[in-house]
Amino acid sequence: MLGATALGSQAKAWARHDTALKSSDSPGLPLSVGRIKQSASRWCYGKIPLPDLCRSAKQIGLSAIDLLQPEDWQVVQDNGLVCSMGYPTKRNDFIATGFNDRANHAMLLRELEQTIPIAGKQGVPNVIAMFGNRKGKSDAEGLATCVEGLNKIKALAEEQKVTICVELLNSKVDHADYQGDHTAWGAQVIEAVGSPRVKLLYDIYHMQIMEGDVIRTIRQHIGHIGHFHTGGVPGRHELDDTQELNWRSVARAIADAGFTGYMAHEFVPTRDPLTSLAEAFKTCDV
């Protein structure tokens, strides 16, 4: 538990970024000097109590906390931030059990039907979903089955103004057998569903591992993307000079493409976590 001690240790780091940081008692001020709304994934900062994380994130300049269960949404809202991506449920097999298997549809639809109206009421703009593990399915079969399932929930998402973001993950290092492991395939699903409320969660860490060519891919598919996650390659650590990507250039490409959603930092800090988060914010604040 870091709490107030961690907050105090951040004073020097925050001072270095004084053009971007806004105090938590000045809600009328913009949270960012740049064009991208930035967020922090909750699980990467699990040792920090959520209210403390919210206060720290707001001081750094972030506007949201990402990947929260519904019981935590109000905590974030009470601290003047947004839950940028909500979970529809708690399940150990959440990633593997996705829309590419018709046997999962009843459960997935029930979870989303219960959660989307709550998200709409509480101002949560996005909920996360998964394509699921391949388990021998062809690309064509998985695509058709995903479209079939997502078509059954898109009307509710449109009605509630909540976007279902289906995540792209790598199957090479972290999630063996995951079917949604290439942008072009995921974009075909989104195109076939044809709803402004069903989009891709483009995880830059995962797609750099699988296919690279990140900036061109983002430009090509920006209309299919509803949300971004960051994470350095290799290792899923800080967005610094140990990584393959020029993160400032990536962020600038996203902003230049007219993206208005959230970029959530989902890296595992190797140093002081809030200092690393402040540095990532500054890097991507374009």
Q: For each predicted feature, which ranges?
A:
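Histidine-acidic metal/acid-base catalytic patches
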Residues: 1-58, 123-125, 180-202, 206-286
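Active-site acidic/histidine proton-transfer and metal-coordination neighborhood
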Residues: 3-11, 98-199, 209
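Active-site-proximal loop/turn and secondary-structure-junction residues that shape catalytic pockets
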Residues: 44-46, 69-71, 89-91, 133-135, ...
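Catalytic domains of carbohydrate-active enzymes, especially glycoside hydrolases
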Residues: 52-73
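Conserved beta-strand positions in the central sheet of alpha/beta enzyme cores
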Residues: 64-66, 85, 128, 165, ...
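Short acidic, glycine/proline-enriched helix-loop-strand junctions
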Residues: 73-87, 146, 162
